[in-house]
């Protein structure tokens, strides 16, 4: 009888230990719009690998690339509800939550990668991410898409005036709609997973994205003209569900934050090293590449200044803070 009781207690203890271990194991979903092989997807995979390494495999992150979990707006709602744990998306899209994130969509804000890194990794970028907590979002780190360029199926763009009349897909927010209108083109807000079909079916003439996105999504199959305009730099936000974050212990939070910081640096390096190669690949794929002359580039900046002034008025404090930080960097 005594031996049976001991066996029963040992078995119960084993089950309890197993239950605790199982309870500590977690699997998170990581959604992003870019396909497998894109630098952002590579950054997401690196994050998953780092999280697994830092938690001894106890936390697993499954990456769902190519928009298979839905568009950005739906994904943000799911993240706030805790049904998707991790996202990587254009920081400007978060203007739907905190209007000040619109500043990341202003044309010609950053002169280069060095400035962008200093801003997003410094107090300015961290302060904006911290404000997301009130919206059920934890901002972990910034990655990048890079500088955006315009493609279309109708004509080469050699001058700013060539952009007029084109029906261009834009990220669904007000500033992107307005800068396209300022150039005399017709903006069409559209979720990213719909863009290829929209181009293929001629519902839109063109779109604008960094070279890596144009290549990875095979837009060259349905777009023959590429204008290297570098009109807008796109930081990306690596964000986490606060609803889930609040259930985690300090050690797990630290592992996730450290993994995000390391994956961010890795992703940017990969993206930048691929940029020149991407342009060559697009040329080989048959795209006709044009660049605006310095005079036309200046004309483009001038046409977009009223858009920046209009949208900057609503977030004047944030714009002034960013411009002050940029002024320090440019001394």
What are these regions (language model features)?
Residues 18-20:
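N-terminal signal peptide c-region/cleavage motif recognized by signal peptidases
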Residues 4, 10-13, 24-115, 123-126, ...:
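N-terminal secretory/targeting leader peptides
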């Amino acid at each position: 009888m005594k031996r049976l009781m001991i066996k029963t207690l040992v078995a119960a203890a084993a089950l309890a230990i197993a239950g605790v271990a199982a309870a500590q194991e977690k699997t998170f979903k990581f959604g992003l719009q870019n396909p497998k092989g894109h630098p952002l997807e590579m950054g997401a995979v690196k994050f998953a690998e780092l999280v697994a390494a830092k938690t001894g495999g106890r936390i697993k992150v499954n990456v769902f690339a190519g928009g298979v979990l839905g568009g950005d707006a739906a994904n943000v709602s799911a993240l706030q509800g805790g049904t998707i744990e991790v996202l990587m998306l254009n920081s400007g899209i978060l203007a739907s939550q905190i209007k000040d994130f619109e500043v990341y969509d202003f044309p010609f804000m950053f002169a280069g990668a060095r400035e962008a890194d200093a801003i997003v990794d410094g107090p300015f970028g961290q302060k904006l991410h911290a404000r997301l907590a009130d919206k059920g979002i934890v901002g972990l780190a910034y990655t990048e898409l890079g500088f955006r360029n315009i493609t279309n199926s109708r004509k080469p763009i050699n001058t700013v005036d060539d952009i007029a009349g084109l029906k261009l897909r834009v990220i669904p927010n007000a500033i992107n709609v307005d800068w396209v209108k300022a150039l005399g083109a017709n903006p069409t807000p559209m979720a990213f997973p719909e863009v290829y079909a929209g181009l293929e079916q001629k519902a839109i003439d063109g779109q604008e994205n960094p070279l890596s996105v144009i290549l990875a999504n095979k837009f060259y199959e349905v777009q023959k003209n590429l204008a290297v305009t570098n009109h807008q730099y796109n930081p990306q936000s690596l964000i986490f569900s606060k609803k889930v974050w609040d259930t985690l212990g300090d050690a797990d939070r630290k592992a996730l934050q450290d993994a995000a910081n390391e994956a961010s640096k890795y992703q940017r390096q990969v993206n930048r090293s691929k940029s020149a190669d991407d342009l060559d690949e697009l040329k080989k794929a048959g795209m006709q590449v044009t660049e605006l002359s310095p005079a036309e580039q200046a004309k483009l900046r001038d046409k977009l200044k009223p858009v920046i002034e209009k949208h900057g008025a609503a977030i004047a404090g944030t714009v002034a803070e960013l411009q002050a930080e940029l002024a320090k960097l440019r001394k």
